[in-house]
Amino acid sequence: MASAGKPALDDSRRGTGSPKIKGRENAKDTLCRNITIYGRCRYEDKGCAFNHDPHKVNSSNQSDSKKRFNVDSPSFTPSLLSSNGSSPTSTPATTKKMTTISPKAANAAPFQPRSVVSRSNASTPGLRQDTVTPDWTVAEVQEFVPQGFDNSHLAALQGNGNGPITSTSPFDPFVTTPTPLSAGGAVGPVQPNPYSHDAAAALGGAAFFPGAAGFQQPVQYHLYAPIGPHNQNTLGYQRNVHDLFLPNDFREELQKKAAATLQTLPNTQLPAQIDYFHSLVPLDLNHQKNATIFGFPSWVYKAQSSKDGNYYALRRLEGFRLTNEKAIRSVQAWKRVCNGSVVTVHDAFTSRSFQDSSLIFVTDYHPLSKTLAEQHLGAGQQRFQGRHNVQHIPEQILWGYMTQIANALKAIHSNGLAARVIDASKILLTGKNRIRLNACAIMDVVQFDSQRTVADLQRQDLVNFGQLIVTLGANSPTVMHNPTKAMEHFTRAYSPQLKNSVFWLLNGMQKDQDRNIDVFITGISSQLMSTFDSALHLDDQLTSDLSRELENGRLVRLMAKLNFVNERPEYEHDRQWSENGERYFLKIFRDYVFHQVDAQGDPVVDLGHVITCLNKLDAGTEEKITLISRDEQSCFIVSYKELKKALESSFQALMKPARRMH
């Protein structure tokens, strides 16, 4: 068997011998190198054997490739199939037969790949189906076109160590193709979003990594962000100096409150210290004793605490003697009342610092606050006004007072307490139409032995509430001496809704129906929404005013750092602190910012120029400026980026321990 197979092997080896080295018989199909290098060949007409037509070479290559790879060639069909993986027995006859192709192969179907097999075919691999149509063809598959990916970012994305790059999201706002995989249109690289602080979002979602992996761009602190509301009639490019600071009226109000808080009274006859309070300043405008409300003369002082350094209001009841220790403990329940319409009570104690037995209540201090009696029922206003010149309080302001008092009573009654003192002389006006109930806990101590129930006292609060509104509406503290006439006057001045609400409060002691503060709040819910909307507008205004001062603190710190470095006399002869280098730039930069003069030599006081230069210095922009020395003999062109670097290095050198010990 072995000897019979040798002649076939020898024939096959002789048929596939190594090719001989040929000469230049195929030079006519090779493009001349002179054409490739110089574009022409000087020996083309002098016997150059190579081809000088590039188009002819390309066409010949294409025809050659067609000869080598032709999809129309018949598919390969083996002559003998092995069964169960066993190799057939080789014979000389069969060997010669296997080296040839049957003539029937010319009529065979063209070869088509079957890389995808249906589930039905995969479940029965042993069955052979001769007439099976392919499940899919190459033409049905759409060409893959990547979206939102730029090759320039490939190295940066692979360097994050987050594994392979995931596919981009089909919902890309920067890609205008209608489908996520479009074979017809080509998609260019995605333009980065310049307003995004996320590296992945800047690429339009191409790099879908977590935001923490990307570099977070710093906030542009040198830009002032004008937060609304905006009610000015200026153009978009116009800015006022007042846009960068608080409004003048608001600033003056805050400064006056700060001055009133820090006010002291020298050479006073008041005690130097009461318990842990000192620096007493009287707050009463009327020096006459009045015991109408509490049954004892009361005085109000401002004092500073030795414990926390804050300022508090001390209300003193003159001549009060405590007979029951449980009475003063009732103040502990008022400490739990935390409401914006109630003055917070902090402590209560007795003292003999005024050479008598006094009861002291410690509450929050609101500087420059007035009472409603001083604001609307002042004696000076009523003395010189005739009957027809009385200015009624606007109804919207009265509704604002009612909603705030209702809010205070809601908090007090929810804690099982009663205000018991709802009087115009004991309600503080701490801001524009902003009121707070005051002196609420005093009656619980003074009248501790009272037999009235809490429910009865809460209904009495409703009656006192209604009487207060009628008194304010009539602008007269004695109007309730004649209730019928007072209500007739109130009805003529205000709307039926306000009148009905006041009538309901005045009938609070009647037990014909359930009368409490919750029922009253339900009845005035529409006005509560109006007051709430006004509070939201005020919050927006305060936020806008606060945003103006947001960047000014940063500029102050920058100016302080600049002045720390410039012209230090103790380092004048220190070579390491010479002003010939980068510190000299900072010195003449200060002259550029603050010491400019006009053409006539007059000083230029331009706040906008100062703020602009400091903001550019803090941002470290690439903008270049011209700095001229004081003797006008030297001129330097530097950028804000270089100035910022010089300022930081100089300040760090100043902060070194060796420098501070020098």
Swiss-Prot record:
Subcellular location, record wording: Cytoplasm
Region feature Disordered, mapped onto this chain: 1-29, 53-133
Low complexity bias (residue ranges): 75-102
Residues annotated to bind ATP: 315, 364-371, 425-426
Signal peptide range: none
Disulphide bridges, residue numbers: none
Stretches the record annotates as Knob domain: 565-662
Zn finger intervals (C3H1-type): 26-55
Cross-referenced InterPro entries: Kinase-like_dom_sf, PAN3, Pan3_PK, Prot_kinase_dom, Znf_CCCH
GO cellular component, one term: PAN complex
Domain of life (superkingdom): Eukaryota
Compositionally skewed regions (Polar residues) per UniProt: 115-133
Chain intervals for the UniProt region annotation (Pseudokinase domain): 263-525
Name of a matching Pfam family: Pan3_PK
Molecular-function GO terms, alphabetical: ATP binding; poly(A) binding; protein kinase activity; zinc ion binding
Key words of the record: ATP-binding, Coiled coil, Cytoplasm, Metal-binding, mRNA processing, Nucleotide-binding, Zinc, Zinc-finger
Coiled coil ranges: 526-564
GO biological process: mRNA processing; nuclear-transcribed mRNA poly(A) tail shortening
Family stated for the protein in its record: Belongs to the protein kinase superfamily. PAN3 family.
Subunit-level organization: Homodimer. Forms a heterotrimer with a catalytic subunit pan2 to form the poly(A)-nuclease (PAN) deadenylation complex. Interacts (via PAM-2 motif) with poly(A)-binding protein pab1 (via PABC domain), conferring substrate specificity of the enzyme complex.
Record PANTHER family: DEADENYLATION COMPLEX SUBUNIT PAN3, PAN2-PAN3 DEADENYLATION COMPLEX SUBUNIT PAN3
Domains: entry comment: The N-terminal zinc finger binds to poly(A) RNA.
Function per UniProt: Regulatory subunit of the poly(A)-nuclease (PAN) deadenylation complex, one of two cytoplasmic mRNA deadenylases involved in mRNA turnover. PAN specifically shortens poly(A) tails of RNA and the activity is stimulated by poly(A)-binding protein pab1. PAN deadenylation is followed by rapid degradation of the shortened mRNA tails by the CCR4-NOT complex. Deadenylated mRNAs are then degraded by two alternative mechanisms, namely exosome-mediated 3'-5' exonucleolytic degradation, or deadenylation-dependent mRNA decaping and subsequent 5'-3' exonucleolytic degradation by xrn1.
Name of the protein described by the UniProt record: PAN2-PAN3 deadenylation complex subunit PAN3
UniProt organism field: Aspergillus fumigatus (strain ATCC MYA-4609 / CBS 101355 / FGSC A1100 / Af293)
